[in-house]
């Protein structure tokens, strides 16, 4: 990949680490990243002319595949009318109406520019609404690079082996309580000790930043029960799971209604966007109606709203999500069969069109500790073998994989043929 190598060398002269988000630098797997020139459907094409079946999907947003004609046309039409106004527009109303129609828990909505902004703002709102300061998060869950939440985080922080981050004052995180994910009893014990001090519980209902770890039965129910009993705000970070694991996101899939929901990724169709919303009584505390301040220069950007609306229209259908889930199951089952045939121990998880591959003999994988104990060296061998075969998976053992509606039978069959050879390489190492 000569051209990609040259671009990476050039990037490192001007951009910190050569990338604008750490995981893209391949720190977790070694080697150098391909630089992408374009994408279409389920495929990426790099600067050296190589084609890859893409299971990163821009880290989740591209649920309808890359460069979907309807999304592209919507963006072109919106851009022709102006890129940003800093003033109210009809399209942001339409987006709010669409989100509320698809997700009944959203009584009121506020658009922002990223998932990090959404979680940061939701936490501030929960603290302002309750008058409390303590928050609960879970080990291995990542909610963006918010100071108060960058504690035992997943995603890139986990890939780089950073349990927290320099630059985050101890005073900022001393009100953050970190508990084990999928441990309902630990949550109940914490609430028994200090429930009346807890402003909010924030959780990824499917943990997608320590690979893909769905909730065990009873875990989300315990969060809802404890928050109800103590007047705390339950926040679902559905930035990743939103419209990924079902028409009504993870909350619809598992039947648990949060007080606030954070969204991003899919609702922008590939454009920078985020949103948070929930109970009208809580959202009423947000400026300009209430005292909790939040603002953004580009919030509700008309081009991002147009891309998001076009994308949501493509997946606002239970049949579409069933087909996505079936395609993902075909991939997951095929990977499991080929690993077993090669004599390689793996465990696979799935939630909708998200999946996780773990090199371990523990099955199922349900905890952060199990994820940390996986064979990272085996993953590195598998990752590079797949990349050489033309399959682009997340360059970290701690990131989930994704499918899109564009991942058809030929793409999946190609992937499984490549995986058969990749697992054989893992077995020989």
UniProtKB/Swiss-Prot annotation:
This protein's source sits in the domain of life called: Bacteria
Q: Which cofactor does it need?
A: pyridoxal 5'-phosphate
- Show the PROSITE patterns listed in the entry: AA_TRANSFER_CLASS_3
Q: Which Gene3D superfamilies match?
A: Aspartate Aminotransferase, domain 1, Type I PLP-dependent aspartate aminotransferase-like (Major domain)
Q: Which UniProt keywords apply?
A: Cytoplasm, Isomerase, Porphyrin biosynthesis, Pyridoxal phosphate
Instruction: Tell me the protein family, please.
Output: Belongs to the class-III pyridoxal-phosphate-dependent aminotransferase family. HemL subfamily.
Which reaction equations make up its catalytic activity?
(S)-4-amino-5-oxopentanoate = 5-aminolevulinate
| Protein's GO biological process | protoporphyrinogen IX biosynthetic process
Fetch the CDD domains from UniProt.
Answer: OAT_like (cd00610)
Pfam families referenced in this protein's UniProt entry, alphabetically = Aminotran_3
- InterPro entries membership: 4pyrrol_synth_GluAld_NH2Trfase, Aminotrans_3, Aminotrans_3_PPA_site, PyrdxlP-dep_Trfase, PyrdxlP-dep_Trfase_major, PyrdxlP-dep_Trfase_small
Outline the subunit composition: Homodimer.
Gene of origin? hemL
Q: Organism source for this protein?
A: Alkalilimnicola ehrlichii (strain ATCC BAA-1101 / DSM 17681 / MLHE-1)
Which pathway does the database say it acts in?
A: Porphyrin-containing compound metabolism; protoporphyrin-IX biosynthesis; 5-aminolevulinate from L-glutamyl-tRNA(Glu): step 2/2
* Primary location recorded for the protein, binned into one broad class: cytoplasm
Q: Which GO terms describe its cellular component?
A: cytoplasm
Q: Any idea which residues bear N6-(pyridoxal phosphate)lysine here?
A: 265
Q: How is this protein named in the record? A: Glutamate-1-semialdehyde 2,1-aminomutase
Q: Which is one GO molecular function term here?
A: transaminase activity
* HAMAP family referenced in this protein's UniProt entry, alphabetically: HemL_aminotrans_3
Give the UniProt subcellular location, in the record's own words.
Answer: Cytoplasm
First and last residue of the signal peptide: none
The Enzyme Commission number assigned here is 5.4.3.8
């Amino acid at each position: 990949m000569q051209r990609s190598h040259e671009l990476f060398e050039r990037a490192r002269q001007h951009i910190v680490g050569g990338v604008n988000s750490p995981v893209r630098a391949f720190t977790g797997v070694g080697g150098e990243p391909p630089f992408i020139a374009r994408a279409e459907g389920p495929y990426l094409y790099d600067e050296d002319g190589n084609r890859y079946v893409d299971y990163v999907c821009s880290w989740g947003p591209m649920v309808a595949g890359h460069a979907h004609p309807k999304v592209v046309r919507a963006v072109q039409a919106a851009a022709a009318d102006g890129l940003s106004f800093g003033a109210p527009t009809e399209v942001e109303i339409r987006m709010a109406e669409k989100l509320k129609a698809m997700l009944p828990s959203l009584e009121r909505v506020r658009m922002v520019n990223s998932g990090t902004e959404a979680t940061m703002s939701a936490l501030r709102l929960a603290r302002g609404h309750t008058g409390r300061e303590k928050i609960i998060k879970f080990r291995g869950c990542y909610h963006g690079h918010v100071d108060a939440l960058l504690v035992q985080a997943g995603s890139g922080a986990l890939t780089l082996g950073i349990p927290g981050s320099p630059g985050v004052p101890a005073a900022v995180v001393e009100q953050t309580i970190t508990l084990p994910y999928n441990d309902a009893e630990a949550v109940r014990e914490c609430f028994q000790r200090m429930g009346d001090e807890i402003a909010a519980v924030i959780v990824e209902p499917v943990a997608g930043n320590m690979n893909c770890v769905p909730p065990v039965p009873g875990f989300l129910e315990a969060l809802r029960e404890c928050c109800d009993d103590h007047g705390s705000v339950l926040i679902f970070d559905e930035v990743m799971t939103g419209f990924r694991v079902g028409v009504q996101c993870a909350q619809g899939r598992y039947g648990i209604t949060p007080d606030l929901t954070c969204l991003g990724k899919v609702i922008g169709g590939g454009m920078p966007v985020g949103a948070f919303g929930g109970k009208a009584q809580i959202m009423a505390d947000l400026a300009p109606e209430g005292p909790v301040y939040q603002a953004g220069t580009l919030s509700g950007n008309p081009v991002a709203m147009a891309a998001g609306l076009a994308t949501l229209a493509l997946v606002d259908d239970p049949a579409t999500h069933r087909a996505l889930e079936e395609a993902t199951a075909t991939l997951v089952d095929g990977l499991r069969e080929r690993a077993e045939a090669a004599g390689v121990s793996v465990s696979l998880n799935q939630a909708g069109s998200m999946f996780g591959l773990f090199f371990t003999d523990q099955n199922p994988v349900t905890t952060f500790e199990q994820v940390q104990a996986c064979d990272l060296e085996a993953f590195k061998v598998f990752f590079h073998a797949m990349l050489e075969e033309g399959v682009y998976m997340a360059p970290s053992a701690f990131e989930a994989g994704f499918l899109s509606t564009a991942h058809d039978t030929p793409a999946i069959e190609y992937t499984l043929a490549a995986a058969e050879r990749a697992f054989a390489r893992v077995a020989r190492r």
